[in-house]
Swiss-Prot record:
It comes from the Eukaryota. PROSITE patterns: G_PROTEIN_RECEP_F1_1 (PS00237), G_PROTEIN_RECEP_F1_2 (PS50262). The keyword Methyltransferase does not apply. The lineage of its organism: Eukaryota, Metazoa, Chordata, Craniata, Vertebrata. G-protein-coupled receptor of lysophosphatidylserine (LysoPS) that plays different roles in immune response. Acts a damage-sensing receptor that triggers tissue repair upon recognition of dying neutrophils. Mechanistically, apoptotic neutrophils release lysophosphatydilserine that are recognized by type 3 innate lymphoid cells (ILC3s) via GPR34, which activates downstream PI3K-AKT and RAS-ERK signaling pathways leading to STAT3 activation and IL-22 production. Plays an important role in microglial function, controlling morphology and phagocytosis. One of its GO terms (cellular component) is plasma membrane. This is Probable G-protein coupled receptor 34. Induction: MAPKs and NF-kappa-B reduce GPR34 mRNA expression independent of TLRs and TLR stimulation also reduced GPR34 mRNA levels. The gene is Gpr34. Residues 1-54, 103-121, 186-209, 284-303 are extracellular. Gene3D superfamilies: Rhodopsin 7-helix transmembrane proteins. Disulfide bonds join C120-C197. GO terms for molecular function: G protein-coupled receptor activity.
Amino acid sequence: MTTTSVDSWLCSSHGMHFITNYSDQASQNFSGVPNVTSCPMDEKLLSTVLTTFYSVIFLVGLVGNIIALYVFLGIHRKRNSIQIYLLNVAVADLLLIFCLPFRIMYHINQNKWTLGVILCKVVGTLFYMNMYISIILLGFISLDRYIKINRSIQQRRAITTKQSIYVCCIVWTVALAGFLTMIILTLKKGGHNSTMCFHYRDRHNAKGEAIFNFVLVVMFWLIFLLIILSYIKIGKNLLRISKRRSKFPNSGKYATTARNSFIVLIIFTICFVPYHAFRFIYISSQLNVSSCYWKEIIHKTNEIMLVFSSFNSCLDPVMYFLMSSNIRKIMCQLLFRRFQSEASRSESTSEFKPGHSLHDLSVTVKMPQYSTKGN
């Protein structure tokens, strides 16, 4: 979450240089010369790749999550706990997607940030905040499904709709408190005229931030372990029920639900595991003295892994469709109404010829009726 803090970077005609230092403003706040190391780095290819992928993620994710929100808000009946969680995940995904245009413009502008250190911190923190909100809520979704499927009928309502609302409120409150804390600390520290954002930085004198990032990584792996255990248990129980009720007409739905559960697990693994597996190396390199070659590899790898995490905002709408039968029904109803309205519109336009009014048509229809009476 804090990896987007602005450092001092150096641009030259020979390529992009990034400067690692012991303090963001050591050269301004101390009379001594800061211990800095200039590392040449060519980011033209990386910027092109990031711009392309973030643009695709922005367009697809924006459309998908707006449709998802429309569907969630279109559920007029009482929402269950799963739908409450999914609604909040969609909101978090949209907020993350709204951060992507800033990253896109930054890379298009040859990695030059012109909007100030405060907005850089706001955009970067919002990006990571909403990513971890999604991860936490997906963990609660897996726990909720495990309880509802694996417990007895009397205990299926262990997590009620009201409790899920409380959980979401707590998650958002803690996240917003952390977000405001980061912004306040940035304001107290004071800004500088750096034109760089979203990049690698050393944390030799900022071990507290490194520890905080490490805690987030540990939290992710605990949630990931919870999701794995939950969906494996869910899948086994559903497949066992499907075999027991193989003669019933609806026995196939249990096997389908089990497969969908593993698809959700696969989506989560593809998007978040590579990034968080690499985070241990990334954080360690920030605390230790590393060569310029190693820092360049770490920086570029981290940016690519972050693209995978962002891609989750495109795949979450697919997960919504797989996890909730009500959402599938509403989506089918919306599509049916859309096609029905298009069909009725085309039929109505085909009945009228260009140049004829509705009155002219009614006259031509009535004329044969008068002639038959005359006969």
